[in-house]
Structure formats: C-alpha cells, structure tokens
Regions:
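Switch II (G3) loop of P-loop NTPases
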Residues: 144-151
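Conserved SAM-binding loop of SAM-dependent methyltransferases across substrates and taxa
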Residues: 76-88
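Conserved beta-strand signature within the Rossmann-like core of class I S-adenosyl-L-methionine
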Residues: 166-177
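Short, polar loop motifs at secondary-structure junctions
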Residues: 95-103
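Short, conserved active-site loop motifs that form the nucleotide-linked donor/cofactor pocket
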Residues: 109-110, 142
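Rossmann-like AdoMet/SAM-dependent catalytic core
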Residues: 3-63, 67-70, 77, 113-114, ...
C-alpha cells in the first residue's frame, strides 16, 4: 500500500469513528486560526486550471512573466500542468514523486524527478530549496502546486520565507485538517499556515470530497479533512474584499462518486 492510499485509509478510519488521539485544542485558538485563513476576493479574478474534477484548481488570473511551475506529488493525470503550459509561453514544469516511475505526460516542458519533497535531502527526499536551486537560475516569479499527502506541513515550516516569496501563486492540498482539534497537531499545522501567511493571502478554498468520511465536527465547527487552498503573494493584491458565498461558480467536485462538500460558512463569513 503506497503512502497516498495508507494516508487515506487512516483518515477515513479516524473520521468514521471520530477518533481523537491527543488532548483537544482550545476552541478559541482554532477559531482564531480559521479567521486568518478566510479567503478574500482580490483585483485578480479566479480561473480554473486543469481538469473538471480532481487535478483542477482555481487560481488568480495573474500569470504574466511566470517562468516555472514546481509540482510535487504526481497522480495519473497532469491536467493542471498541461493547461498552464498552454497558457504561459515558455513555462517549464518540474514534477517530483518517489512513488511513481514517470510523469503521466510527456512534453518538452516537463521535467520529472523520482523523489519526494520533504524537510531533508537524501537519496529519497529533497528540500524545496535544493530542488529549485538545481532546476532554475531564473529570478522571475514561480508557481507552486503541492499535493504531497501530509508532508506539506514540514515542507512549509522548513522553507525560508525568502524562498516562499519566489512563488507568486501557491496551491496546496492540505491533509488531515480534522486533527486541528488535537493540541499537538494544531501546533504543527498552525505553524505551517502562519509561515505562508507572512508572504501570501488565501484567495480560495475548496474541500476535497474524495475522503469518504468528510469532516470532523467539533464544538459547532466543521473541519473537512482535506482542502485545497490557493494563495496569492501579498504584493500582487491591490484591492480586496470579503467573499460572501461559496462554492465559486468554477468549483467542481474532486470525485463524481459522491456529492461535493460545500465549504462551511464560518470558513469565509
């Protein structure tokens, strides 16, 4: 069983039986974090990049002068990468995943490396800093799209603020968010969010409905287990307002096997 399937198995198990594995977090701490993560509407409209279901994401229409996409976590489709290659002339796409043998698509702009992204570099892992240093000398802006089954937290915590600031747009699928109710996990997860919020702001959230038992209910709050977050670097934001309703007109369920999970309103009101 690979990491992706193993993570999904335990997530479903814990959510089904509402298993909490440590001391619960103070509800006020949790509400404060969620308040920081509420998405905003900016001067850049959102567009859908990629497929109609899993693998497609909403990002700001702010793509000029972006040189590279770094996309760790490879699935059997690469519609996001394919779409961006069509939209951004000369874009180079760097993919990485130790659990697969090759990129799902062949294109002159695609470069695949058989490694996981993590907080150390060795024969199986590399850090975001080492990966970028190895692949590009460009000083222009980059895009990061990351779906790495829970490793996103240690990667963000380990990555220097200066390096995160290289990415104009960041799309991350955050896993195990139901564990925000647990004190130990909350410290780890919130540290990652606080790191990225120094340089970027949330412009979109979409719960992933591929997890069978979708969320944990905690003191009146609903915490979807897996959610896609889109961030835009602060210097690209000239004006912003609150978002009044979800889902976005371009949102689509990640799987057709079950109904989409609508973002609970306290995540944006």
């Amino acid at each position: 069983m690979n990491i992706r399937k193993l993570n999904k198995f335990f997530t479903n198990l814990f959510l089904k039986f509402n298993i909490v594995t440590s001391k619960t977090v103070d509800i006020n701490k949790l509400k404060l974090l969620i308040n920081l993560l509420k998405p905003i509407k900016t001067n850049h409209k959102l567009i859908r990049i990629g497929g109609k279901n899993d693998g497609g994401y909403l990002i700001p229409d702010d793509l000029e002068n972006i040189d590279c996409l770094f996309s760790p976590g490879v699935s059997d489709v690469a519609s996001f990468e394919q779409d961006l290659i069509k939209r951004i002339k000369g874009l180079r796409c760097f993919l990485a995943d130790f659990s697969v043998q090759n990129s799902p698509i062949k294109h002159k702009s695609i470069n695949f490396e058989k490694k996981f992204l993590g907080s150390i570099s060795n024969e199986k892992f590399f850090t975001l800093k080492d990966w970028i240093t190895k692949k590009t000398k460009s000083k222009n802006d980059l895009i990061l799209q990351m779906d790495i089954e829970g490793f996103e937290y240690e990667v963000l915590i380990n990555t220097e603020e200066k390096l995160l600031n290289r990415f104009r747009i960041i799309v991350i699928e955050f896993h195990n968010l139901e564990k925000l109710t647990e004190e130990f996990a909350f410290k780890f997860i919130s540290a990652a969010f606080e790191k990225i919020l120094k340089t970027h702001m949330v412009v979109h959230i979409h719960p992933n409905n591929t997890v069978k038992h979708l969320c944990r209910k905690y003191k009146g709050l609903e915490l979807p287990s897996v959610m896609e977050f889109t961030f835009l670097r602060k210097d690209r934001i000239k004006t912003f307002t609150k978002i009044e309703r979800f889902p976005h007109i371009l949102d689509r369920p990640c799987t057709k096997k079950r109904a989409d999970f609508i973002l609970p309103d306290f995540w944006y009101h």
